[in-house]
């Protein structure tokens, strides 16, 4: 496989490492057995045989993941997954970002990372409705997924590359 390199290595606008938690149940999340204070990202994941797959990727900015998962749209998503895949024990993995440059975590940065995660991890069974068919940003972005990354690609990049 051919290797590609950043055209402007020192000009990556958004460089983030996301530490993904081990899978946790909804019950563990709602019983506050999971530290979710720093999590900005989450994924609904299911185990198929020996492999985990991500079926939904989302973000939170002004609320906790547990609060988000009590909202009506997420209750509908859980019901849809339980209906489509009744034998799967759905779990969550929470993502804590570490932005590798000076600056605040902003809504725009979180939105850009979420969009690229969704777009780059799409497959036929994903239940995300937006950000699956296209992604655009005026930023060059590098995401390194770390920790429990079985359902994810280790690196996702967006920008001008050369070979």
Question: Can you describe what each PLM-predicted range is?
Answer:
Residues 1-55, 60-163:
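Boundary/linker segments flanking structured domains
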């Amino acid at each position: 496989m051919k290797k590609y390199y950043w055209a402007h290595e020192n000009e990556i606008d958004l460089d983030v490492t996301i530490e993904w938690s081990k899978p946790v149940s909804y019950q563990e999340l709602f019983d506050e057995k999971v530290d979710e204070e720093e999590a900005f990202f989450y994924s609904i994941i299911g185990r198929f045989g020996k492999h985990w797959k991500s079926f939904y990727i989302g973000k939170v900015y002004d609320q906790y993941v547990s609060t988000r998962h009590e909202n009506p749209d997420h209750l509908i998503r859980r019901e849809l997954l339980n209906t489509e895949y009744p034998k799967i024990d759905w779990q969550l993995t929470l993502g804590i970002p570490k932005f590798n440059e000076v600056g605040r975590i902003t809504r725009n940065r979180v939105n850009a990372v979420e969009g690229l995660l969704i777009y780059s991890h799409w497959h036929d069974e994903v239940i995300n409705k937006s950000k699956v068919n296209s992604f655009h940003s005026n930023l060059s972005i590098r995401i390194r997924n770390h920790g429990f990354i079985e359902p994810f690609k280790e690196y996702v990049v967006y920008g001008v590359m050369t070979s």
